[in-house]
Amino acid sequence: MPHQQILMLFGLLPVATNISTWWNFGSMLLACLTLQLLTGFFLAVHYTANINLAFSSIIHITRDVPYGWMMQNLHAIGASMFFICIYIHIARGLYYGSYLNKETWLSGTTLLIMLMATAFFGYVLPWGQMSFWAATVITNLLTAIPYLGSTMTTWLWGGFAINDPTLTRFFALHFILPFGIISLSSLHILLLHEEGSSNPLGTNSDIDKIPFHPYQTYKDMLMLTIMTIMLLTIVSFFPDIFNDPDNFSKANPLVTPQHIKPEWYFLFTYGILRSIPNKLGGALALTMSIMMLLTLPFTHTSKLRSMMFRPLMQLTFWTFTATFLVISWTATKPVEPPFTTISQVAALMYFLFFISNPIMGWLENKIMKL
């Protein structure tokens, strides 16, 4: 296909006239992925995956490599931006019923799992105190699996404790997974354009559409500019805002940090894990906190797609959002009353959202006589 025809095809891509700013986060995620790949490549060039040299190599990157500090900060804060965008992207999908486009939703949830795995492996690489202990706590959860747990943990560690082989394979996984994310993102976009984007009203968009260019391209560029300004402001003025003070010390297996906690974007899953006083139960709850998203296309009972005209479901959704924030907050606190009770109630409410979704839909149908 000639170059002009491809451009024309892209320019004439029909898009619903009424899609709001919440639909811009997909293109922002693509920008985040590109940024992470570029900065990640330049960091990998200078990084050494060895337990004796990893921490020193990060210091070398920030001090000696030209613009290394910028690459490192862009990569670390870019990951936070990535998760901010993906959580908003998922929230929009929940609110406006985008999950009814099953294939797109299921591929997107798989992308989220891959992204979380990549971020976890990346957090271990600097080999600071919190990196080491976060890796120890999370990989230890595999031992909760009956029969196979211990074997799987030893296999993942490459020995009987977290050591040099663990760091090497985590670096390899952190390097290879983004290529899987690129492939799956392409599939995600392909599946989306089979049916086309939904819109805030949840109606069929075919009756009123406009060309993608110039309307949506300018809208995308505006949001990307805002995100870039935010990113560069944080990198320039508050580069350590998301960092844990413990991670500025080299990993020491003999000294346990007073309070082990992951990066902010994993706090809600960690909070759910900690709220259950049983290892296997906690590991299952942690897994289910993400896997429950896969059930949404199959439990939608309402005759209306979007929550725009569903006040009961709106109340449920915003309660769910508040619950997400409360769990994240309690996960930063020590395991003692009242935080344990708050996190247990919040974890229960988190899962109740997925149970109440079909019930609320059925109830609204009855009330509105649909």
UniProtKB/Swiss-Prot annotation:
It is found in: Mitochondrion inner membrane. It comes from the Eukaryota. Heme b b562 binds at H75, H174. GO terms for cellular component: mitochondrial inner membrane; respiratory chain complex III. Its cofactor is heme b. GO terms for biological process: mitochondrial electron transport, ubiquinol to cytochrome c. Heme b b566 binds at H89, H188. InterPro entries: Cyt_b/b6_C, Cyt_b/b6_C_sf, Cyt_b/b6_N, Cytb/b6-like_sf, Cytochrome_b, Cytochrome_b_C_euk/bac, Cytochrome_b_N_euk/bac, Di-haem_cyt_TM. Keywords: Electron transport, Heme, Iron, Membrane, Metal-binding, Mitochondrion, Mitochondrion inner membrane, Respiratory chain, Transmembrane, Transmembrane helix, Transport, Ubiquinone. One of its GO terms (molecular function) is metal ion binding. It is a multi-pass membrane protein. The chain crosses the membrane at residues 25-45, 69-90, 105-125, 170-190, 218-238, 280-300, 312-332, 339-358. Signal peptide: none annotated. Binds 2 heme b groups non-covalently. A ubiquinone binds at H193. The cytochrome bc1 complex contains 3 respiratory subunits (MT-CYB, CYC1 and UQCRFS1), 2 core proteins (UQCRC1 and UQCRC2) and probably 6 low-molecular weight proteins. Belongs to the cytochrome b family. Component of the ubiquinol-cytochrome c reductase complex (complex III or cytochrome b-c1 complex) that is part of the mitochondrial respiratory chain. The b-c1 complex mediates electron transfer from ubiquinol to cytochrome c. Contributes to the generation of a proton gradient across the mitochondrial membrane that is then used for ATP synthesis. Heme 1 (or BL or b562) is low-potential and absorbs at about 562 nm, and heme 2 (or BH or b566) is high-potential and absorbs at about 566 nm. This is Cytochrome b. It comes from Chilabothrus strigilatus strigilatus (New Providence boa constrictor).
